[in-house]
């Protein structure tokens, strides 16, 4: 069945979890749609975030690999499932100064940019698409932007301004899925929703 195939492939959830174990990464031998396209002579590109590999020691020296849990990891080319153009990272939530590995970078050669992650990724995607115009070869591009994600406040002020007057309580009215004001999660929602929308 489809369900047993999912678990055979070790996919145990479709969202991040603080209780998810390492060892559930997408297996290198799993055949993905990107592998199929690459085999059919597509040019393939991936830009953005992808929790593709689990961190391993010595951890990549980024802020989110210090402490109890390491999050960020480089993905070697043979594990990228056919994606040849690569501007990506495992996870990095400083959205106003993100970091990336390009297609040929070794594990210790990531770089930072002084631009909001989604804007940088959109610019790189536009460049990639424009570079394909003269080719008769088909292409596929995935752009996986991190925000909206914690560090909700890490969004350019011009986008925050669009939501500064949003009536948060009106948004919460008649919504049983939003926790009550005064509760931990209710307050978290109310404190972050404007920036979430700004992302």
Which residue ranges define each predicted feature?
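A structural signal for well-ordered alpha-helical scaffolds and beta->alpha junctions
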Residues: 30, 79-80, 118, 122, ...
């Amino acid at each position: 069945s489809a369900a047993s195939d999912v678990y055979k492939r070790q996919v145990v959830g479709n969202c991040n979890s603080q209780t998810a174990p390492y060892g559930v990464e997408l297996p290198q031998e799993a055949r993905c749609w990107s592998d199929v396209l690459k085999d059919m002579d597509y040019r393939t590109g991936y830009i953005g975030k992808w929790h593709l590999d689990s961190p391993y020691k010595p951890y990549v020296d980024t802020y989110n690999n210090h402490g109890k849990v390491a999050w960020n990891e480089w993905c070697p080319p043979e594990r990228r499932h056919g994606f040849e153009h690569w501007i990506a990272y495992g996870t990095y939530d400083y959205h106003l100064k993100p970091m990336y590995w390009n297609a040929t970078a070794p594990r210790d050669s990531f770089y930072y940019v002084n631009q909001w992650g989604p804007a940088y990724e959109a610019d790189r995607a536009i460049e990639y698409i424009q570079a394909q115009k003269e080719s008769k070869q088909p292409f596929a591009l995935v752009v996986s932007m991190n925000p909206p994600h914690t560090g909700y406040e890490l969004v350019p002020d011009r986008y925050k301004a669009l939501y500064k007057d949003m009536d948060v309580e009106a948004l919460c009215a008649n919504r049983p899925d939003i926790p009550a004001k005064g509760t931990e999660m209710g307050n978290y929602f109310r404190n972050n929703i404007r920036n979430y929308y700004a992302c």
